[in-house]
Amino acid sequence: MSDVCAVVLAAGEGRRLRPLTDRTPKALCPVGNVPLLDMALDRLASLGLTGPDTVAVNAWYLADQVVAAVRGRAHVSVESGPAPLGTAGGLGALRDWIDGRPVLVTNVDAYLAGGRLAPLLEDWDGDGTRLLVAAGPPAEFSGRRFAGCSALPWRRVRQLPAEPTDLVRTVWRPAEAAGELTLVDYDGVYLDTGTAESYLAANLHAAAAAPGGRLIGPGATVTGRVNHAVIGAGATVAGRVERAVVWPGAIVRPDEQLVDAVRYDAGGTVTAALNEGAPE
């Protein structure tokens, strides 16, 4: 469809990721040395959805950082209330911008790799509701789980109030009850990066294709032992880093061992032991 618009939901606090998100919004947490927001905008661009007339991003927590990071690539809806508006309320606040168009909605914390997003929109008439789904728990929809993207018709979006509400109860379940919900299987790897464990798993999956599973950003200084890790731009690694992430500019001292963890500043560390079922 030529008139589809897109919304990146990026207003959340990222509470499950704290302390990683104490000073950095979830949307700007890097996966494979790329901020989640940039990943979301790139996957929309792969569908031909670009620019502030076609793509919107909502923001609430540390909104000034999100606005600065968008850099004019999308329309920004800044929510100013005491709490974020949620997945449905965020769309309600964008009704005037959406203005009658069907909308592709993607969560900023969705990590999608190695698969195609295009089937979500293929042969879509813009009237039904579609969910991208993947195998694995929690089995929310016919034994599958939501995979971070949905395609919604205007007739359902126009009813959404600009108040804290979620899409599960206001759109998806009503569409399911009406027999209007279509599930589209994602043929790649999907992770919800909202926890430290899944955030680490996404990073290591992104690094797996690099030599030795080492993804090292520009300007990083690495004199220590690094295996299966992501090292951010300008980071300094003198100790041992294994199955771990070192954020841009962060430091790992010679006497340190960073294993199954995220180093998010000079000394701040979050441990995140991986589950056996984490993708490789």
Feature locations, PLM:
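Short alpha-helical oligomerization interface
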Residues: 22-27
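Catalytic-core segments of class I nucleotidyltransferases/pyrophosphorylases
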Residues: 103-104, 111-126, 136-207
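Residues at the starts of beta-strands that form the adenosine-phosphate
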Residues: 5, 52-55, 128-130, 153, ...
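Conserved N-terminal catalytic core of the sugar/cofactor nucleotidyltransferase
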Residues: 1-8, 16, 30-108, 112-117, ...
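A structural motif detector for beta-strand N-caps
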Residues: 213-224, 229-231, 235-246, 250-252, ...
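Conserved beta-strand scaffold positions in the cores of enzyme catalytic domains, especially
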Residues: 28, 76-78, 129-132, 181-183
